[in-house]
Amino acid sequence: MSTKEKLISHVMKEEPVGSRSKVTVVGVGMVGMASAISILLKDLCDELAMVDVMEDKLKGEVMDLQHGSLFLKTKIVGDKDYSVTANSKVVVVTAGARQQEGESRLNLVQRNVNIFKFIIPNIVKYSPNCILMVVSNPVDILTYVAWKLSGFPRHRVIGSGTNLDSARFRHLIGEKLHLHPSSCHAWIVGEHGDSSVPVWSGVNVAGVSLQGLNPQMGTEGDGENWKAIHKEVVDGAYEVIKLKGYTSWAIGMSVADLVESIIKNMHKVHPVSTLVQGMHGVKDEVFLSVPCVLGNSGLTDVIHMTLKAEEEKQVQKSAETLWGVQKELTL
């Protein structure tokens, strides 16, 4: 008899039980790993699968996490074969070429489209009912690409979008007002990145509109220069990349925030990238961030945001920029 047989007496043969809340992270780079650890520490799933083409790096990261299993309640698996991702509830795609210092997100695009042509069909093959969350940049275009390549309905393909931009915005407003970011309600919509749109008309604390107190807020004529906060949001990622080489922690926490709303069916409103054709005067088939309700089925509703004419014009300009790139893509 083996030690195990001496220790444990078997009562019944276990039926294989599928995971109830499996999450897959595709890509074990800095963003993938920050997303993975954020999901694990929030205890969001009973199984976390990780997949990447870089076999040694993947194996090392998975082992490193598995060595912490005692401190977690999640089974951790990893393989370069996509069968490891089978029956995932949410698949988070972080894989792709990394943005170089000074490189615009749009510049990355065709490099990443080619990577997606391999990734997306594999995800669909093993998790045909999953919710697909795209994080790789440029996120709005790649969410459109994932939607086209997957054949999924639009409510099951979501881009992480401006969830992080809005978090940065709220943090910086909080710093200026000496308040916690959760008490500063503020939204950034449109493109994740350089042409994002701050909705100054909606910024409020405890229901008090800040533009009501300072009608010049967010304009050139504002003596308090609130506009600089949006510039800091846009420049924030570039600044972090310049200082440490990449961004990871905040986007990882932002991803876990979105996964939580889906897995726990919270019906929370998040600014995420979705098909906005027909909204805010957008005519083309583009994905941009607007406030959306996330739950167990994916993106269930879109909030009709009241935008000022100038804000709406900026969203339309974003859409035109993205469509200009999208129509050149070879899918």
Swiss-Prot record:
NAD(+) binds at residues 29-57, 98, 137. One of its GO terms (cellular component) is cytoplasm. Pfam families: Ldh_1_C, Ldh_1_N. It comes from Patagonotothen tessellata. The keyword rRNA-binding does not apply. It catalyses: (S)-lactate + NAD(+) = pyruvate + NADH + H(+). Homotetramer. InterPro entries: L-lactate/malate_DH, L-lactate_DH, L-lactate_DH_AS, Lactate/malate_DH_C, Lactate/malate_DH_N, Lactate_DH/Glyco_Ohase_4_C, NAD(P)-bd_dom_sf. Belongs to the LDH/MDH superfamily. LDH family. Substrate binds at R105, N137, R168, T247. The gene is ldha. This is L-lactate dehydrogenase A chain. One of its GO terms (biological process) is lactate metabolic process. It is an enzyme of class 1 (oxidoreductase). Keywords: Cytoplasm, NAD, Oxidoreductase. Interconverts simultaneously and stereospecifically pyruvate and lactate with concomitant interconversion of NADH and NAD(+).
